Regions:
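Short, acidic loop-to-helix structural element flanking the phosphoryl-transfer center
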Residues: 1-24, 30, 34
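Short beta->alpha linker loops
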Residues: 3-7, 28, 87, 107-110, ...
């Protein structure tokens, strides 16, 4: 059962208005991820939606993140910067495997301490902190 946490649309809108490129990287299969995002109108709030493959070539979070990077032309050597935002250990581990920091969302599905144990650089407890924490990260 999928839902959107209260305040997420407003936080995403603020980040988009401030010029951030936003992408969803999910381990849900792409063919499921896109319709779910469309149902909640997330497709209008982000720049891209990337999910796992049907042929099992892209299952793990780091594989999905790398696939998203390839599609958007992310180039760290050219100065591009990214931050993973997630609510499970798979997000933190996937970020680490791609050389990224992970901002943990304490309101999600993680067990207490899970995000910190897996290397999230910070865990926030309220949706209302999201945009400002991301903006602070990139200053």
């Amino acid at each position: 059962n999928n839902t959107i946490y209260d305040g997420i649309p407003e936080q995403l809108s603020k980040l988009r208005a401030d010029g951030y490129y936003l992408a969803i990287a999910s381990c849900k299969p792409q063919y499921q991820c896109i319709p779910i995002c469309e149902h909640f109108h997330l497709d209008t709030m982000v720049n891209g939606i990337y999910g796992a493959s049907e042929d099992n070539s892209r299952l793990d979070k780091d594989q999905v993140i790398q696939w998203a990077f390839d599609h958007i032309g992310f180039d760290e050597a050219a100065g591009d910067k990214a931050l993973m935002v997630g609510d499970r250990w798979t997000d933190a581990d996937g970020a680490k495997a791609c050389g990224l920091d992970c901002l943990g969302c304490g309101w999600g599905y993680a067990e207490p301490g899970e995000l910190k144990e897996h290397g999230a650089y910070k865990v926030i407890d309220s949706v209302s902190e999201l945009a400002q924490t991301i903006e602070d990260y990139f200053v």
